[in-house]
Regions:
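Short, structured helix-loop boundary elements
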Residues: 5, 25-28, 91
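Short, functional N-terminal and low-complexity linear motifs
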Residues: 1-4, 29, 60-66
């Protein structure tokens, strides 16, 4: 390969620079504090997504419950999605589901 930098080398270098120069560390600490406070106050964490992001939301919900001990939920049940979409419109189903299930102290 020699001393030539490859596309991948440059890409990784760019990512490192962007991470170092970003607010990622500060934001991660703030997010961790939010999660800890939610857990201490018996709050829940709701994950939501559309399409493939619904799978990510489902996976994150399990990870946060299992690994962090924070009760986490997602709205990936077909009957809930179709019921709320039918009654309130597809563009409103998540909002309406949160209005029904979210309690004070929960985070989304």
């Amino acid at each position: 390969m020699g001393s030539k930098k490859t596309f991948i080398d440059n890409y990784i270098e760019d990512i490192k620079l962007n991470l170092v120069n970003s607010d990622l560390i500060k934001n991660s600490a703030e997010f961790n504090e939010l999660l800890q406070n939610t857990k201490l106050n018996n709050g829940r964490c709701f994950f939501m997504g559309n399409g493939a992001s619904a799978s990510l939301a489902s996976h994150a919900s399990v990870d946060f419950s299992k690994q962090a001990g924070l009760l986490s939920m997602n709205f990936n049940e077909a009957n809930l999605i179709t019921c709320y979409s039918n009654d309130y419109g597809y563009e409103n189903w998540m909002k309406k589901a949160l209005e029904k299930y979210q309690q004070q102290g929960d985070i989304v």
